[in-house]
């Protein structure tokens, strides 16, 4: 195993942050100029959105089921089982829906982007694109960025709805609660700030998934082994950053809306 000094490691971190920032800046800047590769963007939307839909639906539904069961156990001690709908709605819309959807899409698509672009890098397809006058960032990264941000937004909404539906299913069938009471308490517990918070988070998560996945793919070296390493690094880094962004956005929303 090769050891490096703390100074060299710090320089590597700074260089990586710099390269990642430049990649993000170029990818975002390309959105506002031609060519935009619309067909590639729609292809990525289909792959990311439609391809991720089954796991998002299942994850959201069963998360809502478990959440309702656990909430009922705790609320029963206070005689407040009827408030299960409130807890499920708030938890899914503000936290679990955005975070779990981001993690599911990250595991599926950040790894896919890293492996796909990494394979292109080690097979010198990226260099061939540059030689032909095509900007790899504009062609490969920007369509994935736009598609991921756009589709993750709607996937999160679907996950929230499935989670609430799962909570309602368990509440009605196992906990013998009234469906009207479940949905009423859930609806009345929400304020505009909760909805805004739940819809802002997937925008940041989508940005992280696409840019991190593409960044590690484009920096791949070392053949097929390097592709595997880049794929693993992309999933780990994007997952950690999604949770970090969730914390920061939650703290910001609490400061703005007080909850």
Positions of predicted regions on the chain:
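Membrane-interface helix starts
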Residues: 33-57, 239
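Hydrophobic alpha-helical transmembrane segments of multi-pass membrane transport proteins
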Residues: 84-127, 155, 212
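Short cytoplasmic-facing helical segments at TM-TM junctions of multi-pass membrane proteins
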Residues: 117-142, 224-227
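Active-site cofactor/substrate anionic-group-binding motifs, chiefly glycine-
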Residues: 46-100, 104
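Membrane-interfacial helix-loop-helix connectors in multipass membrane proteins
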Residues: 70-93, 161-203, 211-231, 252-259
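Hydrophobic alpha-helical segments of membrane proteins
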Residues: 53-65, 69, 149, 153, ...
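Short, membrane-interfacial amphipathic segments enriched in basic
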Residues: 1-39, 216-221
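Start (N-cap) of specific transmembrane helices in multi-pass transporter permeases
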Residues: 135-156, 230, 234
């Amino acid at each position: 195993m090769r050891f490096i000094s703390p100074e060299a490691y710090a320089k590597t971190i700074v260089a990586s942050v710099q390269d990642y920032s430049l990649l993000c800046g170029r990818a975002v800047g390309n959105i506002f100029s031609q060519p935009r590769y619309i067909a590639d963007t729609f292809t990525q939307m289909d792959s990311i959105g439609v391809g991720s839909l089954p796991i998002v639906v299942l994850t959201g539904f069963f998360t809502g089921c478990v959440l309702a069961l656990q909430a009922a156990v705790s609320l029963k001690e206070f005689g407040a089982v009827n408030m299960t709908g409130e807890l499920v709605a708030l938890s899914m819309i503000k936290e679990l829906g955005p975070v779990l959807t981001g993690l599911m899409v990250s595991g599926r698509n950040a790894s896919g982007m890293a492996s796909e672009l990494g394979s292109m890098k080690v097979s010198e397809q990226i260099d061939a694109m540059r030689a032909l006058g095509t900007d790899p960032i504009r062609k490969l990264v920007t369509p994935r960025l736009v598609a991921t941000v756009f589709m993750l937004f709607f996937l999160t909404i679907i996950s929230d709805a499935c989670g609430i539906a799962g909570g309602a299913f368990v509440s009605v069938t196992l906990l013998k609660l009234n469906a009207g009471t479940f949905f009423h308490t859930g609806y009345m517990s929400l304020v505009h700030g909760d909805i805004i918070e739940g819809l802002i988070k997937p925008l940041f998560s989508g940005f992280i998934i696409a840019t991190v996945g593409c960044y590690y793919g484009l920096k791949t070296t070392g053949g097929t082994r390097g592709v595997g390493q880049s794929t693993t690094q992309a999933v780990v880094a994007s997952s950690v950053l999604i949770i970090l962004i969730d914390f920061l956005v939650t703290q910001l929303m609490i400061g703005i809306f007080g909850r």
